[in-house]
A protein has these predicted regions:
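Short, positively charged patches
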Residues: 1-54, 58-62
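Active-site oxyanion-binding pockets that recognize sulfate/phosphate
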Residues: 65
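Phosphate/pyrophosphate-binding betaalpha-module
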Residues: 57, 68, 72, 76-155, ...
Length: 160
């Protein structure tokens, strides 16, 4: 199934918000093979929040569910890394072009995801990294996921 077929499976409300173009790095079949659940939360996460993200991500992998997150520091990084370490699959939905790791300390993780899992962006190479990209990324993440688990978030969070 290609992205055009995937688009046809969306509801009218979902189609309204689906990005015009998506860029892929990695195994596109992850969008179609299994169930997908987003695990998201604060960049300034607590120890307890990180532990919850780890437990939930391990549990999702155990049930053959793909872990989706946004590659931000904190909860997102823990979700991706735990899925990989647990032998599962992960999808990173980026708020930057595929060639721009954000945060920079996730450069190695992004490369691993692009090689062995899937990274998705709706932003072409050369597109500037701007704060407004990240809520757009969050909407795309929700559109490709069957469910979203919010681990922890502040009142000003883009996760809300």
């Amino acid at each position: 199934m290609g992205i055009e077929t995937y688009f046809q499976l969306l509801t009218d409300a979902e189609k309204k918000h689906f990005p015009e173009k998506l860029f892929f790095g990695g195994d596109e079949d992850l969008l179609y093979e299994k169930r997908r659940v987003s695990v998201v939360g604060s960049r300034a996460s607590s120890k307890e929040g990180l532990q919850r993200a780890k437990i939930i991500s391990k549990t999702l992998v155990k049930h053959d569910i793909i872990v989706v997150s946004g590659l931000a520091k904190g909860i997102d990084t823990m979700a991706h890394q735990t899925a990989i370490d647990s032998g599962g699959k992960t999808i990173a939905v980026l708020g930057t072009p595929l060639n721009v790791p954000y945060p920079k300390e996730n450069a190695t993780l992004l490369e691993k995801i692009k090689k062995e899992h899937l990274a998705i962006s709706q932003f072409p190479e050369g597109f500037p990294t701007q704060p407004k990209n990240f809520p757009i990324r969050n909407r795309t993440m929700a559109l490709i996921s069957d469910a979203t688990i919010i681990i922890e978030a502040t009142d000003k969070s883009g996760t809300r």
